[in-house]
A protein has these predicted regions:
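SH3-family beta-barrel domains
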Residues: 23-54, 63-71, 96-153, 166-170, ...
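SH3/SH3-like beta-barrel superfamily modules
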Residues: 108-110, 115-117, 168-212, 285-319
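SH3/SH3-like (including bacterial SH3b) beta-barrel domains
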Residues: 157-173, 276-289
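Gly/Pro-biased beta-strand-loop elements
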Residues: 318-428
Length: 474
């Protein structure tokens, strides 16, 4: 269990025993939001060379900030809740002490001693077979944290009668310790509260937030490691090829009963048809551009493949299989969690998988001009210093996204998008932007995965084409 969480538990016990509020000042939120996000919409769309009507309808190689605010102010729970709390996004997790069972036993006993019913302990650990050697350590955050859905009070105890010791705003994050039963709030139909912790002026603070006002987020390291094992098993037989149909260069596959999406959630555009038999009259599903495949055999213009992460085997027309730019060695993996809006980056160092970076990310959302970031196992296909994007519904270049690595169709992992400024009819580059407040909150891109620009730059330099895979989990 993290030393930080153990300290917070003992501080909580002392405060409950004394029945006094902690002598803390209200926590001031560092609510610096990126100027680009406050004053303009981010429009991200890769420039498409082929601007035929079909391409514009089918391609969706697009990135644009949707029309909703991530930091919309909600009414506080109490009239006096006007102060905000200090930004805790950079709280680091370093000291590990004990395991999950020890953590639950200690917290459960101490909470019970004070009349609190423990529902759940949050104590995510790095899997034992993974070492940690961070090569990028900015914006570190607790492995378990809350994303606030509304403005909320932080209270001394899980009751509305308890002292308010701080406030936190919507779309901010807070390290998470446990879930307990507290006051039942009729309007929400809920009696669940989250115990949170933070560091203020070198002192560990702890308090409670009503659960309906927040969403639990976690780093699913266990699931990330399992996905690496799946990929390793597929790569054990030799290099992995990938599906190649960027911008439908090899032809758009047929529709499925008149539909452009299959039952697995993959789209027709920039995919290949995966047939059950080596003929075009056979039933098929879509396999997206960039998806890694194991080549099994060839027959009559078809290639039989085992798609990494898919059940069964499929026949794909030869023209959609790229074996020249293959995953020759599996040494580096970027894993994005679509559910939690975060990611982990792993490298094989001296035969040992090592976590070298973890942090927040933003994935795509379905919309008129946008798509969810597709699940699956992909090739890191190419790197670009930047790519240009259109304003939605036009062929007007709106800006660029820096330090981009393409993994599927028009989907890249990249830094914060930059909108050009227009002066005297000319595009002016205002310079790269490091930070975007919405990163790691809700899905809002058009398929791409947004990172803080310094992390995108790190990945761009670190990733080797032919040795790096890109995985999207949920």
């Amino acid at each position: 269990m993290k030393l930080l969480k153990l300290l917070s538990v003992f501080i909580l016990i002392l405060s409950l025993t004394a029945c006094l509020a902690l002598p803390v000042e209200k926590w001031q939120l560092n609510d610096e939001k990126n100027e680009a996000e406050q004053n303009q919409e981010i429009h991200e769309k890769e420039v498409i060379e082929d601007n035929t009507e079909e391409q514009q309808v089918q391609d969706n190689d697009i990135e644009r900030e949707p029309d909703f605010e991530t930091g919309h102010e909600e009414e506080p729970m109490e009239e006096e809740d006007t102060d905000k709390v200090e930004d805790i996004d950079k709280v680091e997790e370093t000291d590990e002490l004990g395991g999950q069972e020890e953590a639950e036993e200690i917290i459960n006993q101490e909470e019970a001693n004070q009349g609190l019913e423990l529902i759940q302990v949050f104590n995510t650990q790095i899997p034992e077979n993974i070492t940690v050697e961070l090569k990028y350590d900015k914006y570190l955050i607790s492995y378990d944290y809350l994303l606030m859905l509304k403005n909320a009070n932080i209270r001394q105890l899980p009751t509305v009668e308890a002292d308010i010791i701080g406030n936190i705003g919507a779309m901010e994050r807070m390290p998470l310790v446990a879930q307990v039963k507290g006051d039942y709030l009729k309007e929400w139909g809920n009696d669940s509260w989250y115990q949170v912790e933070w560091e203020e002026k070198g002192e560990i603070k702890t308090g409670f937030i009503f659960s309906s006002l927040a969403e639990v987020r976690q780093f699913q390291f266990d699931k990330m490691v399992e996905s690496i094992k799946v990929l390793e098993q597929s790569a054990s037989s030799g290099p992995l090829a990938h599906i190649s149909n960027y911008k439908n260069v090899n032809g758009i596959p047929p529709k499925i009963n008149g539909h452009t999406w299959d039952s697995y959630g993959y789209r027709r555009s920039q995919s290949a048809a995966g047939y059950l038999e080596p003929n075009k009259s056979s039933k098929f599903r879509y396999i997206p551009d960039g998806m890694l495949v194991q080549v099994l055999e060839k027959k009559d213009g078809f290639t039989k493949v085992k798609v990494v992460g898919f059940e069964g085997e499929y026949w794909v027309l030869d023209k959609y299989i790229n074996s020249k730019k293959s995953l020759n060695k599996l040494n580096k993996v970027i894993i994005v969690d679509r559910k939690n809006q975060n990611q982990g980056v792993f490298e094989l160092i001296d035969g040992q998988w090592t976590l070298i970076s973890y942090g927040l990310s933003t994935t795509g959302v379905n919309g008129p001009y946008s798509l969810e970031t597709p699940l699956g196992y992909y090739m890191a296909i190419e790197k670009r210093d930047k790519f240009l994007y259109f304003e939605d519904g036009t062929t007007n270049i709106a800006g660029y996204a820096p330090y981009a690595i393409r993994f599927s169709g028009g989907g890249y992992i990249h830094g914060v998008p930059v909108n050009y400024k227009i002066k005297d009819g000319k595009r002016i580059d205002p310079g790269m932007i490091e930070y975007l407040h919405s990163i790691g909150t809700t899905p809002r891109s058009h398929m791409c995965v947004r990172n803080y620009t310094s992390h995108a730059k790190f990945l761009h330099s670190w990733a080797d084409i032919g040795e790096t895979a890109f995985i999207v989990i949920e």
